Structure formats: structure tokens, C-alpha cells
Swiss-Prot record:
Pfam families: Cpn60_TCP1. Forms a cylinder of 14 subunits composed of two heptameric rings stacked back-to-back. Interacts with the co-chaperonin GroES. GO terms for molecular function: ATP binding; ATP-dependent protein folding chaperone; isomerase activity; unfolded protein binding. It comes from Campylobacter jejuni subsp. jejuni serotype O:6 (strain 81116 / NCTC 11828). This is Chaperonin GroEL. ATP binds at residues 29-32, 50, 86-90, 414, 477-479, 493. Its EC number is 5.6.1.7.
């Protein structure tokens, strides 16, 4: 297929058109008074969302060059969501503002490479200031405030997440599911999660969620590889008689053994699944022992003189349920005795106190969280499926933002932190580098401008008032239309969200500004179908009878 090559300003202007269209669709969702976006689906009912990344992912433009620009910024939104869980709209609005301002300067003759260098230096300085402005999340109230802001000012969701985090701790596992009723619920169940997924997608029991869900399974723990099926046969025969599911956790399962397990699963002979044991070396042995204590089972270990053939049902652990996706396994309500679990927890605490290695301490704390923390399940309720999906997206966002806040701390929200950080930086740059830094500094006003515009206020007046406020915690509460102390009003953002949004926005905008040529496919028009009207209904074929 023929390709079209476009250079310099013409190429950048086309890319900008795509970025602008994406930004126009995403920016309307920003702030407490942001609007919804209705998205047509190829099948089923349309979805309604106020989630920036959900909107960005749906934007596909007809013009291939414009679509290239839009797709780069779409990637920024996705990456920001993956890294920080929120801030996708902020990243998109910042990327657009930086690209727009940069384009004007480069068209006027500024050197793109020097401009990029200045932008990077300004970004680095602002990130450093944001870290200085941040402070730790102190209590449950602040956790609820962060979650509420990220869930589009839904206090009920904010309080649910704060309750969940209080019950399982900041290192605990919190999952989000759909409720069977219209009410939101929080269930906390004892459980353990580790980062190993199913060994074969053929084990999946829930095709919609792509997960394996086992109810009241037996759990076989083995510390070596399983390659030969005959070693497994005795215990499999015992399991088949009980009719219960089986989860095998081993160093690996390969070849004939895995193939036979898959065949038995597909034929319905056994409800079975298998995952690799978590960790490596001595840490793997310790984690297998943790799982054994939690589930009331034994680790079948050749070092202890046990072979897989000698395993019986009495050696197997049990749990009320096990959920496995492609990356993680969660064991819920292990059948282990509480006294044994408490003894193991105390043993790990003693090891944490004794160790001098930061890495070992971190891994021991992970094991402690898995053993002592439970699994919190937030069940989201709604009246319709469309509302359910929109609400579940908001809860997922709020949960990620809350974890980010606990991890790196909080700053004042509503776009004010970026403006306060801008006021504090002092860069000594010359020429086009200074222009690059000024572009980023001017763009930092964009999130607050957009929040004010969406709420129906004069953006210029709002930005000016926040910039000139004497108290560094003063910002604009768009929901009430007032200038307030953002910390006291609970309008706060995780510093990680602001930091990641800015870094990603500067990265993609500088990439677009230093683009000098674009290569895209030329869409060829398909030839029209030939005119069939002259055939006269094939009347001339009547003589063939």
C-alpha cells in the first residue's frame, strides 16, 4: 500500500488536530461538575462514563494522521491510569496545553530540541516541588477524602474504601465486584493472595471474567516440578471419590502431567486447576509453608522424605474458595488452625525485627500481610447494568488513587498543587530552553482552568485568584464555587497522581513537538460496483428454455 510522507509544520498541525479532538472529548469530564460522555458500543446498550481513560480509549479518528496524534495522547491516559490509577484527564489536559503552546513557539522559529530540554528541566523541578509540598496520609478520614474526590465526590464510595483499608491494612488485598442488589456492600474475608496465575487457560471456569473459581477445594502443595502423571494418580483417585475441586501448587507442572490434567478438566472428570508456587529458592519453601499453615495442609517435600505418590487426602489443605486469574491466586478462608497461624505470624515478626537487609525485611512484611491481612471485597450495587459499569469504574479509580496516596502522600487537589509548585521553582535558563520551561509553567494552569470552566466560572479569574492567594493551601472548590483551604475541606489528591500525570504529559508532548515527519498509509477508495441496470432482468435468456 502506498504511503504518504508529510513534513514539519504541516505534520505537527495535523497531529495537533487529533490531540485537540481527543482532549475536547476527555476534558468535559474533569472536576466535580464535569459532565458525562455517552459512548456507542458495537453491541449492547451504550455506556455512560465520567472516567477520562474510558473516554480516551474509545476515540478513533477517520484521518490517519490525526489518529496518530490522538493515539499517542490516548497512550498517556492509559499509562497514567496503570501507574497511578487516576489523573488520566489531568494528563490529557496537560499534554494538550503543552503541545498547543509548544507548537506556537516552534512555528515562530524556536529550536524543538532546545525547547524539549527546557521542558524536561521544568518538569523535573516541579516534580521535586510537589514532593516537598506532599504530606503523609494521617488517618482514616483523609483516606476517605482521597477516595471520595477520585470517585467524583461520592462520599459513600470514599467511606467504603476507607473502611476496607482500615480492616485489611494498607498492604491488604481489596477487590471490587458487582453486587446482586442495588446496595453497596463491604465484605472482609480472611485470605491470602500471591502473584501466580493459572498454568493453562483451559482451567478457566468463569469465561466472562477469565478466572478460575473453585468452591471448597482441596489444595495440594509440592515443592518440586511435576512432570510424570503416575506420581499424581493416587491422590487424584482419592479426590475424584470426594467430588470436590483440587488446586495444585507446585514449582511447575509440565508435559504429560499438565496435558492430562487439562483433558480431565475438559471432560468433566475432575474440577482441577494448577498454579506455580510463589517466590524462588528458600523464599518459595517458606511461602509454601505459609500456605500450608493457612490451609491446614502439609507441604509434600522430598527433603522430608515424602514423595508425591505417598500423598493422601489428610496431607491436603482446604479453603472455602480459591479465585485465580492470569496473574494472581487468592485463597479465601483457609482451614488452618488459628493457633498455628498466630504462631507463624509471630515467627515472621521476630524475623523482621532481626533482619538487617532492607530487601529481606520488605519480603517478610509482604508474607506477614498475606498471612494476617484479609481480603476485602467491595460489592458495587446499581439499578441498571450501565450504571453498574460506570460506578464500578469509579470505585476502581478511587481504590487505586487511595493506594497511591498511602504510598507517596497527598497534596492539595483541584489543580491547585501544580500552581503552587510552579510559584516555588526558580530556573536559570537561557534562549529556547527558557521558552521550553515557560511552556510547561503556563500549561500547569490548564487543569484548574478546565475545572473552573466545567463548573461555569470564569477560568482566568479563578486561576488568578488561586495564584495570588497568600495561604499556600488555598484553592478553588468548584462544587461550591468558593475559595477555601483545600486541606480543611478535604479536597486532596495523591502526589503520585499529579507527578505521574505531569511526567507522562511532558513526555508525549515533547515527543510530538520534536516530530519532523510523519509516514501514514494512503487510504485508496474502493472501486464502485458496476452498473447492473443494463442487464434488463436477463430477459434475453428466455430462448434457452
Amino acid at each position: 500500500m502506498a504511503k504518504e510522507i508529510i513534513f514539519s509544520d504541516e505534520a505537527r498541525n495535523k497531529l495537533y488536530e487529533g490531540v485537540k479532538k481527543l482532549n475536547d472529548a476527555v476534558k468535559v469530564t474533569m472536576g466535580p461538575r464535569g459532565r458525562n460522555v455517552l459512548i456507542q458500543k458495537s453491541f449492547g446498550a451504550p455506556s455512560i462514563t465520567k472516567d477520562g481513560v474510558s473516554v480516551a480509549k474509545e476515540v478513533e479518528l477517520k484521518d490517519s494522521l490525526e489518529n496518530m496524534g490522538a493515539s499517542l495522547v490516548r497512550e498517556v491516559a492509559s499509562k497514567t491510569a496503570d501507574q497511578a490509577g487516576d489523573g488520566t484527564t489531568t494528563a490529557t489536559v496537560l499534554a494538550h496545553a503543552i503541545f498547543k503552546e509548544g507548537l506556537r513557539n516552534i512555528t515562530a522559529g524556536a529550536n524543538p530540541i532546545e525547547v524539549k530540554r527546557g521542558m524536561d528541566k521544568a518538569c523535573e523541578a516541579i516534580v521535586a516541588e510537589l514532593k516537598k509540598l506532599s504530606r503523609e496520609v494521617k488517618d482514616k478520614k483523609e483516606i476517605a477524602q482521597v477516595a471520595t474526590i477520585s470517585a467524583n465526590s461520592d462520599e459513600k464510595i470514599g467511606n467504603l474504601i476507607a473502611d476496607a483499608m482500615e480492616k485489611v491494612g494498607k498492604d491488604g488485598v481489596i477487590t471490587v465486584e458487582e453486587a446482586k442488589s442495588i446496595n453497596d456492600e463491604l465484605n472482609v474475608v480472611e485470605g491470602m493472595q500471591f502473584d501466580r496465575g493459572y498454568l493453562s487457560p483451559y482451567f478457566i471456569t468463569n469465561a466472562e471474567k477469565m478466572t478460575v473459581e473453585l468452591s471448597s477445594p482441596y489444595i495440594l502443595l509440592f515443592d518440586k516440578k511435576i512432570a510424570n502423571l503416575k506420581d499424581l494418580l493416587p491422590v487424584l483417585e482419592q479426590i475424584q471419590k470426594t467430588g470436590k475441586p483440587l488446586l495444585i501448587i507446585a514449582e511447575d507442572i509440565e508435559g504429560e502431567a499438565l496435558a492430562t490434567l487439562v483433558v480431565n478438566k475438559l471432560r468433566g472428570v475432575l474440577n482441577i486447576s494448577a498454579v506455580k508456587a510463589p517466590g524462588f529458592g528458600d523464599r518459595r519453601k517458606a511461602m509454601l509453608e505459609d500456605i500450608a499453615i493457612l490451609t491446614g495442609g502439609e507441604v509434600i517435600s522430598e527433603e522430608l522424605g515424602r514423595t508425591l505418590e505417598s500423598a493422601t487426602i489428610q496431607d491436603l489443605g482446604q479453603a472455602s474458595s480459591v479465585i485465580i486469574d492470569k496473574d494472581n491466586t487468592t485463597i479465601v478462608n483457609g482451614a488452618g488452625e488459628k493457633a498455628n497461624i498466630d504462631a507463624r505470624v509471630n515467627q515472621i515478626k521476630a524475623q523482621i525485627a532481626e533482619t538487617t537487609s532492607d530487601y529481606d525485611r520488605e519480603k517478610l512484611q509482604e508474607r506477614l500481610a498475606k498471612l494476617s491481612g484479609g481480603v476485602a471485597v467491595i460489592k458495587v450495587g446499581a439499578a441498571t447494568e450501565t450504571e453498574m459499569k460506570e460506578k464500578k469504574d469509579r470505585v476502581d479509580d478511587a481504590l487505586s488513587a487511595t493506594k497511591a496516596a498511602v504510598e507517596e502522600g497527598i497534596v492539595i487537589g483541584g489543580g491547585a498543587a501544580l500552581i503552587k509548585a510552579k510559584a516555588k521553582i526558580k530556573l536559570d535558563l537561557q534562549g529556547d530552553e527558557a521558552i521550553g520551561a515557560a511552556i510547561v509553567e503556563r500549561a500547569l494552569r490548564a487543569p484548574l482552568r478546565q475545572i473552573a470552566e466545567n463548573a461555569g466560572f470564569d477560568a482566568g479569574v479563578v486561576v488568578n485568584s488561586v495564584e495570588n492567594a497568600k495561604d499556600e493551601n488555598t484553592g478553588f472548590d468548584a462544587a461550591k464555587g468558593e475559595y477555601v483551604n483545600m486541606l480543611e475541606s478535604g479536597i486532596i489528591d495523591p502526589v503520585k497522581v499529579e507527578r505521574v500525570a505531569l511526567l507522562n504529559a511532558v513526555s508525549v508532548a515533547s515527543m510530538l513537538l520534536t516530530t519532523e515527519a510523519t509516514i501514514s498509509e494512503i487510504k485508496e477508495d474502493k472501486p464502485a460496483m458496476p452498473d447492473m441496470s443494463g442487464m434488463g432482468g436477463m430477459g434475453g435468456m428466455g430462448g434457452m428454455m
